[in-house]
A protein has these predicted regions:
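C-terminal substrate-binding subdomain of Rossmann-fold SDR/epimerase-dehydratase oxidoreductases
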Residues: 206-344
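Residue-level signal for pocket-adjacent positions within structured domains
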Residues: 9, 84, 88, 94, ...
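Short-chain dehydrogenase/reductase
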Residues: 100, 149-157, 193, 197-201, ...
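Short, flexible, glycine-rich and Lys/Arg-enriched loop motifs at helix boundaries
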Residues: 40, 181-202, 213-234
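N-terminal Rossmann-like NAD(P)+-binding domain of SDR-like oxidoreductases, especially those catalyzing
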Residues: 1-186
């Protein structure tokens, strides 16, 4: 029998790509998602891509009784990959309580239910935001956790602590915390990609929608930072490369190969790229010109961060393999697909 994995937020951007990779690796996947920032159509597209239809339950992770019922319905769930969260830095500054409730209580509910239902492990979707503005770059897993620059970043820090404290108390759970950098791009089939409800909060969907003429112009938030061109620098990782890291982490937990009950890995490329460099690479890679403007700095943004992924490279045998050019072309192909389908 295939091992059952629960994926929260599985119709979301990173979640949907990870479900495909899990199914391709032989896992049976159950998705729960409240569809607040995604659509049930994603389940159809996962089936088209992988040839397998995952089980899907529309559910909010804040619903403790509902979660309990899902674990009871799908007996024998071995582990969880927890993506479900509110994730926009700027919005979190404006709506901190929404972020604290959604992101903290959802994890607490899962951790309370895991021992009851014999769930062995959790792969947690953490973030490079836990490092704040690092003292040294590239940033390693040993870098100090800084005061968060946004409520979103703070929820990731607190959630990491909640997991550590829960396991330290003797809970029969193992965890891997994956600190992602900036996932971008879309599945090579152009059947899965980033499709936020409403105005995009992330750079790439806003960029591709601007290139398509859906948005008038792209705002670059700040050109006076202490970077070569004045715009923020990030480590942009292809979403399928990131999804594969989750499968490797899941294998590691279930094969009992962890060195500690809680392990942390940076998941990035090791290359920093400024927002303006990214725009120019998009234009060069696709031949599409972008209408962009410089706007004031945005609250909660850090200046520059990129990963030292060497620990994940050596310990997990994982590496980001896809070039930034191919990644950006995949994002544009996805946007073109949405236009052809009349979705956007």
């Amino acid at each position: 029998m295939k091992e059952r994995i629960l994926v929260t937020g599985g119709t979301g951007y990173i979640g949907s790509h990870t479900v495909v990779e899990l199914q391709n690796s032989g896992y049976e996947v159950i998705i729960i998602d409240n569809l607040s920032n995604s659509s049930a159509d994603v389940v159809d597209n996962i089936e088209k891509v992988s040839g397998i239809r995952p089980a899907f339950e529309k559910l909010d992770c804040l619903d403790f009784a509902g979660l309990d019922a899902v674990f009871a319905k799908y007996k024998g769930i071995k582990a969880i990959i927890h993506f479900a969260a509110s994730k926009a830095v700027g919005e979190s500054v404006e709506k901190p309580l929404l972020y604290y409730r959604n992101n903290l209580v959802s994890l607490i509910n899962l951790l309370e239910l895991m021992p009851k239902h014999g769930v062995e492990g959790i792969v947690f979707s953490s973030s490079c935001t836990v490092y704040g503005q690092p003292d040294e770059l590239p940033v390693t897993e040993k870098a100090p956790i800084k005061k968060a620059e946004s409520p979103y970043g703070n929820t990731k820090q607190i959630n990491e602590e909640i997991i550590r404290d829960t396991i330290a108390s003797g809970a029969p759970i193992n965890a891997i915390l994956l600190r992602y950098f900036n996932p971008i791009g879309a599945h090579p089939t152009a059947l899965l990609g980033e499709l936020p409800n409403g105005v995009p909060q992330n750079l790439i969907p806003y960029l591709t929608q601007t290139a398509m003429g859906i948005r008038e112009k792209l705002s670059v938030f700040g050109d006076d930072y202490d970077t070569p061109d004045g715009s923020c620098i990030r480590d942009y990782i292809y979403v399928v490369d990131l999804a594969k890291a989750h499968v490797i982490a899941m294998n590691r937990i279930l094969e009992d190969k962890q060195k500690d009950k809680v392990e942390v890995f940076n998941v990035g490329t090791g290359r920093g790229l400024s927002v303006l460099e990214l725009i120019h690479k998009f234009e060069e890679s696709t031949g599409v010109k972008l209408n962009y403007q410089i706007a004031p700095r945005r609250a909660g943004d850090i200046v520059k961060v990129w990963a030292d992924p060497s620990y994940a490279n050596s310990e997990l045998g994982w590496k980001a393999e896809t070039s930034i050019e191919d990644t950006l072309r995949s994002a544009w192909k996805w946007q073109v697909h949405l236009r052809e389908k009349g979705i956007m």
